[in-house]
Regions:
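Non-heme Fe(II)/2-oxoglutarate
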Residues: 1-78
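Catalytic phosphate/metal-binding cores of nucleic-acid and nucleotide-processing enzymes, i.e., regions
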Residues: 3-10, 41, 45, 81, ...
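Short, well-ordered beta-strand micro-motif
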Residues: 11-13, 157, 181
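A short coil-to-beta-strand element that immediately follows conserved catalytic motifs
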Residues: 79-88
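Conserved active-site beta-strand element of glycosyltransferases/polysaccharide synthases
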Residues: 91
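Catalytic core of non-heme Fe(II) oxygenases with the double-stranded beta-helix
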Residues: 94-162, 174-178, 185-200
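Short proline/glycine-enriched turn/loop segments at secondary-structure junctions
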Residues: 167-172
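C-terminal helix/juxtamembrane-tail motif
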Residues: 199-207
Length: 207
């Protein structure tokens, strides 16, 4: 908890049990390797991608169940009265990357969960115009402060609006990550982002 308050992120080993981790990993692998639509037809809500094999899903019901079940734990780590926003799961494959970015308001407090696959570091950084860096976000220099290799079942709780994060192109076969997003229920600025504008968790997005 102290680490989160100081650094705006905290790495937690074994936040999911091996049984839950294995179930979720195999569920999303099966979904990605069959003729089912991994994105459930909602791929346009996360922007346009050139990679024809992009597999990402907003509010998959397994992800939404994790979103609900993990809420008390994220509240405890953040020491905030949080309410669920939405879940998002990606099955990344060779060559895909997560470009340096800050998150939107619906991702005020988040956890990224490693469900399995190959090791793939996630990087965190802050704006620093005086640093020697070739990483930029909105034309501002970014200084990397840490790079973390997650193990299956582990999670990183982080402030996505305030902490720049990214992953370099994956040079292995695949990696499955689920992102659970929450907002501060006591902060008036974020109340409109409850359930990410949906009626409740589990519903498909309306935008």
């Amino acid at each position: 908890i102290q680490e989160f308050e100081k650094n705006k992120y905290s790495y937690v080993e074994n936040i999911l049990s091996p049984e839950v981790t294995n179930f979720c990993y195999n569920y999303f692998i099966l979904k990605g390797c069959t003729n089912r639509n991994f994105s459930d037809g909602e791929s346009d809500i996360v922007g346009k991608y050139d990679h024809k094999y992009l597999m990402g899903c907003h509010s998959d019901l397994v992800g939404e169940t994790l979103l609900s079940q993990m809420e008390p734990i994220i509240c405890s780590i953040s020491k905030k009265n949080l309410i669920a926003s939405y879940s998002y799961t990606r099955l990344y494959i060779t060559g895909e990357e997560l470009k340096p970015h800050l998150d939107r308001p619906s991702c005020q407090y988040s956890i990224t969960l490693n469900l399995g696959g190959d090791s793939w570091p996630i990087n965190f950084g802050v704006f620093d115009e005086d640093c020697d860096s070739d990483i930029f976000v909105d034309d501002r220099k970014v200084r990397k402060i840490n790079s973390i290799v997650m193990s299956p079942g582990s999670g990183i709780v982080y402030r996505g609006e305030e902490l720049i994060h990214w992953r370099n192109p994956l040079d292995a076969d695949h990696c499955v990550q689920t992102f659970l997003h929450y907002v501060d229920a006591d902060d008036e600025k974020y109340k409109e982002h409850k359930y990410d504008g949906r009626k409740n968790i589990g519903y498909k997005p309306f935008f």
